[in-house]
From Swiss-Prot:
It is an enzyme of class 2 (transferase). Belongs to the class I-like SAM-binding methyltransferase superfamily. MenG/UbiE family. It holds the Pfam family Ubie_methyltran. It catalyses: a 2-demethylmenaquinol + S-adenosyl-L-methionine = a menaquinol + S-adenosyl-L-homocysteine + H(+). It comes from Mycobacterium sp. (strain JLS). This is Demethylmenaquinone methyltransferase. Pathway: Quinol/quinone metabolism; menaquinone biosynthesis; menaquinol from 1,4-dihydroxy-2-naphthoate: step 2/2. The gene is menG. CDD domains: AdoMet_MTases.
Length: 230
């Protein structure tokens, strides 16, 4: 299987990420034109974490984002269903756990905050994954979802679509260890709901106070929410 399909068979998606793990971080930086670093900083700021907080970084990949979150003084654990991705980040000194977002291997109310960046699209059942995130978060705890979204300017949206479907696959062939995986990336972004649509899914999973903020013209959106009190 060279790339996953949009039916998101978990084993196919995990295998696809295993195949891109070796050059994943470099490829992300190149294909995002360096914006990935900015998106990670904004995600950390939106979480508002600090010493004493317990944080789950879901779909953490090689744990680059987890290390940056841990710089806040919070205790952070990286979780991903791709063992290859976690292995590629083995030199990063944070706890790592392999697990499925729809069946997280953590007890109820284990975390003060949960975040998932560019991974919710790959979960076979988005609402079930969001419900699991709520289960492992304490009442009053925070969720931040950083995900590709819909550009707000029509002309920019047209250019972005051209980049996704034409330029990105060509660039991936030059730098990625599995270029076909980035065709799946482009297709999954096109099929993803817009900002309001994702907000509705988050609310449907039981989160409250859902709001979002656009980054890079809406290419990415940060959705934040709170787990309601009991």
């Amino acid at each position: 299987m060279s790339r996953a399909t949009l039916d998101k068979n978990p084993h196919e998606v995990a295998s696809m990420f295993d195949a891109v793990a070796r050059r994943y971080d470099l490829t992300n930086t190149v294909l995002s034109l360096g914006q990935d670093r900015f998106w990670r900083r904004e995600t950390c700021a939106a979480l508002g974490i600090g010493p004493g907080d317990k944080v789950l970084d879901l779909a953490a990949g090689t744990a680059v984002s987890t290390v940056e979150l841990a710089a806040s003084g919070a205790w952070c654990v990286a979780a991903d269903f791709s063992v290859g991705m976690l292995s590629a980040g083995r030199q990063r000194d944070v706890p790592k756990v392999a697990g499925d977002a729809t069946r997280l291997p953590f007890a109820d109310e284990s975390f003060d905050a949960v975040t998932i960046s560019f991974g919710l699209r790959n979960v076979v059942d988005h609402v079930a994954g969001l419900e699991e995130m709520a289960r492992v978060t304490r009442p009053g705890g925070r969720l931040v979802v950083c995900e590709f979204s819909t550009p707000t300017n029509r002309a920019f949206a047209t250019l972005y679509k051209e980049y996704l479907m034409k330029a990105l696959p060509r660039m991936a062939r030059a730098v990625a260890s599995n270029p076909d995986a980035y065709v799946y990336l482009a297709e999954s972004i096109r099929a993803w709901p817009d900002q309001a649509g994702l907000a509705r899914r988050i609310e449907a999973a039981g989160w409250s106070q859902v709001r979002w903020r656009n980054l890079t013209g809406g290419i990415v959106a940060l959705h934040a929410a709170v787990k309601p009190p009991r």
